[in-house]
Amino acid sequence: EMPIFSEDRERESGHPAQAHAFLERIAGADALVIGYAEHNGSFSAAYKNIVDWASRVNRRVFQYKPTLMLATSPGAGGAASVLALAEKSAPSMGAELIRAVSVPSFHDHFDSGKGVMREGETASRLAAAVVDLEAAVEAARAAA
């Protein structure tokens, strides 16, 4: 289990192995798809903690990877508060933000029996975001 971040703990014990492993996984990825849970209008404690630790090892946690950010909720807000925070922090965290998509009223848009999004505007927005992410990955490969 990842310890809760604190500067005192960092001085005493250094950086946990999980933070290094997290950064290694990101380094090996062509792109990132990050799904945010909204807790009281902000990041979840688990997300905040891993990013706090990882940013002490590499300030640009997302390592300039093409990034698609997603958030959803059962209500009409679609976790828009946390998504706005994520978008605002993207440049300083080293994310090449391709798209950020909020999915409001999740249960209205997702068919849990089939495990798929229902057809409609929300599904179209998600599909377009994936196409844009794929294009960014291909462009990065071509430039390398």
Predicted region positions:
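N-terminal beta1-alpha1-beta2 submodule of the flavodoxin-like/Rossmannoid cofactor-binding fold
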Residues: 1-56, 114-144
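A glycine- and small-aliphatic-rich helix-loop capping segment at beta-alpha/alpha-beta transitions
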Residues: 49-59, 87-92
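Glycine-rich NAD(P)-binding loop of Rossmann-like domains
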Residues: 62-64, 112-117
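Short, glycine-/small-residue-rich phosphate/pyrophosphate-handling segment
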Residues: 63-107, 120-124
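Glycine-rich, flexible loop/turn motifs
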Residues: 1, 5, 58, 93-99, ...
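Short beta->alpha junction loops
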Residues: 7-10, 104-108
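Short, polar/charged, Gly/Pro-enriched helix-capping and turn/loop motifs at alpha-helix termini
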Residues: 61, 100, 140-144
